[in-house]
């Protein structure tokens, strides 16, 4: 007998030999003639002498596999398989791997990094466990249709905007200024400004009749009647002129541009009064409940703009006495720009403490509405869901929810404008878009939606559906007797009584995001529900069809189908109309599988095995079981799968995570799984994706509407207040006040009161005074110049210094005139020793002179003489005569200037007296001691 050949392989991912091709090795045994050496076999060889021995071994261990589940660890298989590559194989491998083969090999390794394979042992089913296929199911039929209604809708919201109208403000601007007049300046010490209302009689008889206004203002302050006159002059009617600046929507007229002020004589207070008649056309605003209105001037009138004396308007709110209010029917106001009269109208006038306001009266119900249109929607779908109506508006990406009962608009105060306006809009849309394709079904319907929105809805029906309904109605009328009438509950939904509440108001949210989110949710819900319904129905139908396929394929391969259905590895067999199944346990970790490299039957040249032969070796020494490799790593505990040997035999079998290739019933090589092309039996599920829906930025209330919610427009008020001075007064005009002019005017008025003679004297006095004032003005102007002031300051400083030195000189003349007149002569007197008498006689001529006393270092020559009493008396006489000479010269000089005889005569006599002066003796010119 020829030896039996075995092929074995160790699985070890850490060794490089694992991925390489196997080489053939054969070893011969005396038992089996076709034995082959297993490459890398590391255990004791197991030799089976004959086929009978295989069956005996199988019967010995079969009971163990049937009663207990033997599991094989994935690692045990690879531990029992090992390939020792030869040198030629390494050379071949290196020849096939180029620069890019390393990357390919790394990719293959990453693809082969899978879980370790599991081998199953499937015993033949004995019929102890039988199953059957479930009969076909009845697939559900989902009806997603709802009661949809097409239509046109107009959505209304709460009107938060103020009611605006034109009003005219009449007042007189009274300014009383008190000024103090200084010598060269004018100072305002007090200023009083007030607004005075213009009487209605002056408005009707002067302003709107002649376009003029009086310069007199009469008003009440502190419970006293006060009068003011422009420029403190007699009153007169002054023409109204347009203001220089006007704001948007506002015009104004006034009588003067100047503010009158009087500057009196220096040191006096004067008061001046100016009265400016001002008429302003302003914007007035009133908000719900319209019990007051505000003006763009900042004033608030606590009276309804709809207050009047007719049509029940006297019931409107008012906080003023009736004598302050006047209403004129057919009143014609004058346009102060064109001087033309306007159309007759009902004119209201109200006199307040500071102004008079006038406006045209109009009925309340025709002017204001508590609701305002928000959106016009041409295509709306209404459906009933959970006892509510849903209005889906795709153009706005919103869904509004309301009750199924209609809403009575009469419950809302001042909502009379809604139906008329909505009807006109719906008629326009229907005429332009749906006139040829749809018909109207009933009248317009109103619903109160969540969030405070009122939906005015017009149901529509396509022409095709209308024809079907008409045919159905004709058929019903033919089949029923004419005595029968429709029951009253056909319109019970609309006939539900609604409790009316008078003066009801609604509050609309400032955001519509909730409606947009509702629309998005409904859109997603509709799409998902429809998709799931279709999938469920299709899935059920597919299962019924697959059931028929399962039933037909079970006789062909019951084990594969049963394993797929039961989601576990089983062995199955058809037993009539039922299926017998048995469980396929996994091999344990103490088992090793050996794959043989030959598929030929020993001793036969025509019979071969159709599946590879394997040997299951237990590592715990319990024995070896021979079998065949089944499909999907199934281990068959028999070798009954035979076939006639054929030429050019080529087979691929899955063994673990790889395919083994047999050619002519002999093992050739191992092939990786990823090297075998794959075809898929799966069908992709093509579902419709959810459509994109973008949220549109919708504003319930615009910025202008939000700005108009208040009673006053503060921006307009600030604009008006800042322009007030520019509009009615000339801020660029400067009036120069001169105190000298004031003095001259006062003196002129005084002399004019004295008559003709006084005027003549006044001209002379005013001329002299004018010259004096001009001189003073020139001097003050020079001083006002910075350089002039600096020069004057320097001169004053120099004068002060000169005065200081002059004062010292005069003081010196008074205290010691000789020292002041003869400082050098008297210098030696300062050098006399203390206690020495300057008038004492010198003892001898050799004594130290006076000039040398106390100064021994003086190198100048000294006068060697002492005090001489005679010389002292002579000096006194000389001083007297010098005084007389000076006086005579002054007298003679004055006489020459005046050319008068008396003065000359006096001068001559004085000279003669001096010449004939007794006691005069000639002064000696030589020194007494002699030099």
Swiss-Prot record:
Its keywords, alphabetically, are: Disulfide bond, Glycoprotein, Host cell membrane, Host endosome, Host Golgi apparatus, Host membrane, Host-virus interaction, Membrane, Signal, Transmembrane, Transmembrane helix, Viral attachment to host cell, Viral envelope protein, Virion, Virus entry into host cell
What Gene3D superfamilies does this protein map onto?
A: 1.20.5.1890, 2.30.29.100, 2.30.30.1230, 6.10.250.3280
GO biological process annotation, one example = symbiont entry into host cell
The chain's disulfide connectivity reads: 122-584, 139-540, 213-277, 369-417, 608-645
Q: Which GO terms describe its cellular component?
A: host cell endosome membrane; host cell Golgi membrane; host cell plasma membrane; membrane; viral envelope; virion membrane
Q: Where is this region: Involved in fusion and/or binding to host membrane?
A: 179-185, 264-271
| Intravirion side stretches | 808-931
- The residue range of the signal peptide is 1-71
Q: Transmembrane region positions?
A: 787-807
The domain of life is Viruses
Q: Where does the record place the site Cleavage? A: 494-495
Q: Please report, in chain numbering, the residue ranges of the motif Golgi targeting.
A: 881-884
Query: Annotated motif Internalization motif: location in the chain?
Result: 920-923
**What is the recorded membrane topology of this protein?**
Single-pass type I membrane protein
Subcellular locations according to the entry: Virion membrane; Host cell membrane; Host endosome membrane; Host Golgi apparatus membrane
Q: Where is this region: Hydrophobic membrane proximal region?
A: 731-784, 764-784
Q: Which sites does the entry annotate for glycosylation?
A: 147, 257, 435, 503, 620, 686
Chief localization: virion
Q: Which residues lie on this side of the membrane: Virion surface?
A: 72-786
Q: Tell me how the protein is altered or processed after translation.
A: A proteolytic cleavage by host furin generates two subunits that remain linked by disulfide bonds.
**Function field:** Envelope glycoprotein that forms spikes at the surface of virion envelope. Essential for the initial attachment to heparan sulfate moieties of the host cell surface proteoglycans. Involved in fusion of viral and cellular membranes leading to virus entry into the host cell. Following initial binding to its host receptors, membrane fusion is mediated by the fusion machinery composed at least of gB and the heterodimer gH/gL. May be involved in the fusion between the virion envelope and the outer nuclear membrane during virion egress.
Subunit structure as annotated in this protein's UniProt entry: Homotrimer; disulfide-linked. Binds to heparan sulfate proteoglycans. Interacts with gH/gL heterodimer.
> What family does this chain come from, according to its entry?
Belongs to the herpesviridae glycoprotein B family.
- Spell out the protein name for this chain: Envelope glycoprotein B
Gene name of this polypeptide: gB
């Amino acid at each position: 007998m020829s030896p039996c050949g075995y092929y074995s392989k160790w699985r070890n991912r850490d060794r490089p030999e694992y991925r390489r091709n196997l080489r053939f090795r054969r070893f011969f045994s005396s038992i089996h003639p076709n034995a082959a050496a297993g490459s890398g076999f590391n255990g004791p060889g197991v030799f089976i002498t004959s086929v009978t021995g295989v069956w005996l071994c199988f019967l010995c261990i079969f009971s163990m596999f049937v009663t207990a589940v033997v599991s094989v660890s994935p690692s045990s298989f690879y531990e029992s398989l090992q390939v020792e590559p030869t040198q030629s194989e390494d050379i071949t491998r290196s020849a096939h791997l180029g620069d890019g083969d390393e990357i390919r090999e790394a990719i293959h390794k990453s693809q082969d990094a899978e879980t370790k394979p599991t081998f199953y042992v499937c015993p033949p089913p004995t019929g102890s466990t039988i199953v059957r296929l479930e009969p076909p199911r009845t697939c559900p039929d989902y009806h997603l249709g709802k009661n949809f209604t097409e239509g046109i809708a107009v959505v209304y919201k709460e009107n938060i905007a103020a009611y605006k109208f034109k009003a005219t403000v009449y007042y007189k601007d009274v300014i009383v200024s008190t000024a103090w007049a200084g010598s060269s300046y004018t100072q305002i010490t007090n200023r009083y400004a007030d607004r005075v209302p213009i009487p209605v009689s002056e408005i009707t008889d002067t302003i709107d009749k002649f376009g003029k206004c009086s310069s007199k203002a009469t008003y009440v302050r502190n419970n006293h009647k006060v009068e003011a006159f422009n420029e403190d002059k007699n009153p007169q009617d002054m023409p109204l002129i347009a203001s220089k600046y006007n704001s948007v929507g506002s015009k104004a007229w006034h009588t003067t541009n100047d503010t009158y002020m009087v500057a009196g004589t220096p040191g006096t207070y004067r008061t001046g009064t100016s009265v400016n008649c001002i008429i302003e056309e302003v914007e007035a605003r009133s908000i719900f409940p319209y019990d007051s209105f505000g003006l763009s001037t900042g004033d608030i009138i606590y009276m309804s703009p709809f207050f009047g004396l007719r049509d029940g308007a006297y019931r409107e709110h008012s906080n003023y006495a009736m004598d302050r209010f006047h209403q004129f029917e057919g009143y014609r106001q004058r346009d102060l720009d064109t001087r033309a009269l306007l159309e007759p109208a009902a004119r209201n006038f109200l006199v307040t403490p500071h102004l008079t306001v006038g406006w045209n009266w109009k009925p309340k119900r025709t002017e204001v509405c508590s609701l305002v249109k928000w959106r016009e929607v041409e295509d709306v779908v209404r459906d009933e869901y959970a006892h509510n109506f849903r209005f889906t508006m795709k153009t706005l990406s919103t869904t509004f929810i309301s009750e199924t009962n209609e809403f009575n608009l009469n419950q809302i105060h001042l909502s009379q404008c809604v139906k008329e306006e909505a009807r006109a809009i719906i008629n326009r849309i229907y005429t332009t878009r749906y006139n040829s394709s749809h018909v109207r079904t009933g009248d317009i319907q109103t619903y109160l939606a969540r969030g405070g929105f009122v939906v005015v809805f017009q149901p529509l029906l396509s022409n095709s559906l209308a024809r079907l309904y008409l045919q159905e109605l004709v058929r019903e009328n033919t089949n029923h007797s004419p005595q029968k009438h429709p029951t009253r509950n056909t319109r019970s939904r609309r006939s539900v009584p609604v409790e009316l509440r008078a003066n009801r108001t609604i509050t609309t949210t400032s955001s519509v995001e909730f409606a947009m989110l509702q629309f998005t949710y409904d859109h997603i819900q509709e799409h998902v529900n429809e998709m799931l319904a279709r999938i469920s129905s299709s899935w059920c139908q597919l299962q019924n069809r697959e059931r028929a396929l399962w039933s037909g394929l079970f006789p062909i391969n019951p084990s594969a189908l049963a394993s797929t259905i039961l989601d576990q590895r089983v062995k199955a067999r058809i037993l009539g109309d039922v299926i017998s199944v048995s469980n396929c346990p996994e091999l344990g970790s103490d088992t090793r599988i050996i794959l043989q490299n030959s598929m030929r039957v020993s001793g036969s040249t025509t019979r071969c095995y159709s599946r590879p032969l394997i040997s299951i070796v237990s590592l715990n020494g319990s024995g070896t079981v021979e079998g065949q490799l089944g499909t999907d790593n199934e281990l068959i505990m028999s070798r009954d799968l035979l076939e006639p040997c054929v030429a050019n035999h080529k087979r691929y079998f899955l063994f673990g995570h790889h395919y083994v290739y047999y050619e002519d019933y002999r093992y050739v090589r191992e092939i990786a799984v990823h090297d075998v092309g794959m075809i898929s039996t799966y069908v992709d599920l093509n579902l419709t994706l959810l459509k994109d829906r973008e949220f549109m930025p919708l504003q319930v209330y615009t910025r202008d509407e939000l700005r108009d919610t208040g009673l006053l427009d503060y921006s307009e008020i600030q604009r008006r207040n800042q322009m007030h001075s520019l509009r009615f007064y000339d801020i660029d005009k400067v009036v120069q006040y001169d105190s000298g002019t004031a003095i001259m005017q006062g003196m002129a008025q005084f002399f004019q009161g004295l008559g003709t003679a006084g005027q003549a004297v006044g001209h002379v006095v005013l001329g002299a005074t004018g010259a004096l004032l001009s001189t003073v003005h020139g001097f003050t102007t020079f001083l006002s110049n910075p350089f002039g002031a600096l020069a004057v300051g320097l001169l004053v400083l120099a004068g002060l210094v000169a005065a200081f030195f002059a004062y010292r000189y005069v003081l010196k003349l008074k205290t010691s005139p000789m020292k002041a007149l003869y400082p050098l002569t008297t210098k030696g007197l300062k050098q006399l020793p203390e206690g020495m008498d300057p008038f004492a006689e010198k003892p001898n001529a050799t004594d130290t002179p006076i000039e040398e006393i106390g100064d021994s270092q003086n190198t100048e020559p000294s006068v060697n003489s002492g005090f001489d009493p005679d010389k002292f008396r002579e000096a006194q006489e000389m001083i007297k005569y010098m005084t007389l000479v000076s006086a005579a010269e002054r007298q003679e000089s004055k006489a020459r200037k005046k050319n008068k005889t008396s003065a000359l005569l006096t001068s001559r006599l004085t000279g003669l007296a001096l010449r004939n002066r007794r006691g005069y003796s000639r002064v000696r010119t030589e020194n007494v001691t002699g030099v």
